[in-house]
Amino acid sequence: MAKDVFSVPVFLVVFRETLETVIIVSVLLAFLKQTLDDGSERHVKTYKTLRRQVWLGVAAGLLVCMIVAASLIGVFYTVGSNSWENSENYYEGAFCLLAAVIITAMGAALLRIGKMQAKWRVKLARAIESPIKAGTRGCFAHWLEKYAMFVLPFITVLREGIEAVVFVAGVTFSAPARAVPLPVCVGLVVGGLIGWILYKGGSTAKLQMFLVASTCLLYLVAAGLFSRGVWSLEAQKWNIAIGGDAAETGSGPGSYDIDNSIWHVNCCSPTAADNGGWGVFNAILGWQNSATYGSVISYNVYWIFVMVGFCTMRFKETKGHYPFAKPKTADPSVNSRSSSSSQQGVDVGKTAGVEIAGAPGA
């Protein structure tokens, strides 16, 4: 039968995790191509360096993910227990929150590039070429700026990869081993194909349209990640309270904390084996069939923070200072020095003119 060689739950899990990864990676690659691949020798060199950072981040995340997965499998078959499962939600929540913060900062920077494209080209080139000086105050910040295109893909691939390994391992207990390889490969290929389409579309679109669309997409993912991170931390707290994994009880009573629940539906669970694609909504939008106060409030707080942040940035661009801050006034000493310099220049010019006028033969 088809289900003996192709497990649909495994395909959905792998496709969901791959999709979230390729969205971020394809946006980064398309952004680099739009911004830096203009034929200039210096910019082309910077473009190749940053593109290499993206792929190195993907490869490093995949390598660490494979090491962690091998360790988990080894511990499971040696000790007979899943050591990751006991604190899975803590790790997932921390990774989600960290990724949301990084994507938020990068999204704001992406949106400003349309007006500051030339400045960003120079800034990226300088960040790549300038060495990191040990012991300086901004050493870590400079390192993050220099290798930003490595850090985000690394964290994304690591988080999604470990999550996929854990979910696939859980699904395979109810499916034959031969039903796993094919859906894993198909999920990776389909997710990669969607990423390639996003990359090609982003590379050929007008820069400002691409920046707006990609930033909106990144913020949707980041908002979902932020909400999922808070939800995972609350889910771990509930697991500790009941002394087990609440997900194993299904979607009915006992699978959620009724005192901390805003809504709950006994279907549409993103973690169920027959989720019917709800896992994709969970990956992109942060959907949960059992919403908690923390997950809903954090989702709304995230968007309020983003709106306030962009309003503040806009105010700073138009007014020259932040809200509730006094406008910068010109330094009188600087003005006096500049005016005296100008007056000296005028006096010198007049003196030179008099000398020329009084010269013989003038």
Swiss-Prot record:
Membrane topology reported for the UniProt record: Multi-pass membrane protein
Matches recorded under InterPro entries: FTR1/Fip1/EfeU
Induction: Expression is repressed by iron starvation and up-regulated in the absence of the sidN siderophore synthetase.
UniProt region (Disordered), positions on chain: 326-350
GO cellular component, one term: high-affinity iron permease complex
Top-level taxon of origin: Eukaryota
Protein name per UniProt: High affinity iron permease ftrA
Highest classification ranks of the organism: Eukaryota, Fungi, Dikarya, Ascomycota, Pezizomycotina
Encoding gene, per UniProt annotation: ftrA
